[in-house]
Regions:
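Preference for extracellular/luminal or secreted protein segments
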Residues: 1-56
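Enzymes and membrane/adaptor proteins characterized by extended Gly/Ser/Thr/Asp/Glu-rich
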Residues: 41-126
Length: 126
C-alpha cells in the first residue's frame, strides 16, 4: 500500500479519504480513461466534451495557442471533469511552449553556450 502522507504526496486525512472514495466510485472505464493524456488541439466545447471528457481522460497535453484560449480551454475542462486533470506542456523554452504570447527564454543548449552559470541557475529556477 502506498503511504499518501509521505513524499511525494503529503496528503492529509481528508485528502486521502477523497482519493479513496473517488477511486472506489470509479467505473473500470473511468479508471482506464485516467491513463490517457491526449494532446489538446481545439478549444471547441463540442470537441472537448466528446473527445476529451467522454473518455474520462487523466490529463491534457497542450500545444501552443493564444494564452486566453489556453486558459479558457483549461478552465472548461477542469470545471467539467469529474476528477481534476493533470496538465502538461512543452515548456523547455518558456511560456511559449503553451501560449504563443508567452515569455520565451533560451533552450538548455543556448544557455550553456553563454558560459554563464548565473543564466543556467535562472533557467533552472524558472
Amino acid at each position: 500500500m502506498i503511504n499518501l502522507t509521505k513524499a511525494p504526496f503529503f496528503l492529509v486525512k481528508e485528502d486521502i479519504e477523497w482519493v479513496e472514495n473517488t477511486k472506489k466510485a470509479m467505473t473500470l472505464e473511468e479508471k482506464i480513461g485516467q491513463l490517457f493524456v491526449p494532446i489538446g488541439y481545439s478549444g471547441d466545447a463540442d470537441y472537448l466534451e466528446h473527445v476529451m471528457l467522454s473518455h474520462h481522460i487523466g490529463g491534457i497535453m497542450y500545444r501552443c495557442g493564444e494564452a486566453k484560449e489556453m486558459q479558457r480551454t483549461h478552465r472548461y475542462l477542469q470545471e467539467h471533469s469529474k476528477i481534476p486533470l493533470l496538465v502538461g506542456a512543452n515548456l523547455e523554452d518558456g511560456g511559449c511552449g503553451i501560449a504563443t504570447d508567452g515569455t520565451q527564454y533560451g533552450k538548455q543548449m543556448q544557455i550553456a553556450a553563454t558560459g554563464d552559470t548565473e543564466d543556467a541557475y535562472r533557467l533552472g529556477k524558472v
